[in-house]
């Protein structure tokens, strides 16, 4: 029952950003799968996505980063296959989660520094703090918090 409650609550929170119910559920399942696969908290990954792309699948930054997790195309040569599409949901999430895990490993679990590396702003507090706030304020989940609503 916990998984059903979690999915319903996360779906409710995402409804304005991803209006299509099926697309929203696929997004949530995919984030959960890829984050868990990389040893990350799915709620953290949703916070990062909120900050990076605003949940826009086809977002492209001025630097050329692509998709939900704003993955730079050079990563395809480093960890992927030449025909990988960074706008594909699972591909983008797999890359983004793998990259964040890589940076967490380099930084020996220091999330602040790993987020700085992910964003290319290592040593600056703004980006890691914004992601943490999105994670904690928008995407944290506990049954006790739901009971208070």
Identify the residue ranges that each predicted region occupies:
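Catalytic glycan-binding domains that act on GlcNAc-containing polysaccharides
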Residues: 1-149
């Amino acid at each position: 029952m916990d998984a059903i409650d979690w999915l319903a609550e996360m779906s409710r929170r995402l409804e304005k950003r991803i209006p299509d119910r099926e697309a929203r559920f696929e997004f949530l399942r995919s984030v959960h799968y890829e984050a868990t696969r990389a040893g990350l908290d799915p709620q953290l990954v949703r916070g990062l996505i909120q900050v990076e792309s605003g949940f826009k699948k086809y977002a492209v930054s001025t630097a050329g980063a692509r998709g939900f997790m704003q993955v730079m195309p050079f990563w395809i040569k480093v960890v992927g296959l030449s025909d990988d599409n960074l706008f594909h949901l699972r591909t983008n999430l797999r890359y983004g989660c793998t990259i964040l895990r890589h940076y967490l490993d380099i930084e020996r679990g220091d999330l602040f520094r790993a987020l700085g590396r992910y964003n290319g702003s290592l040593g600056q507090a703004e980006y890691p703090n914004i992601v943490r706030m999105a994670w904690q304020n928008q995407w944290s989940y506990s049954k006790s918090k739901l009971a208070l609503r």
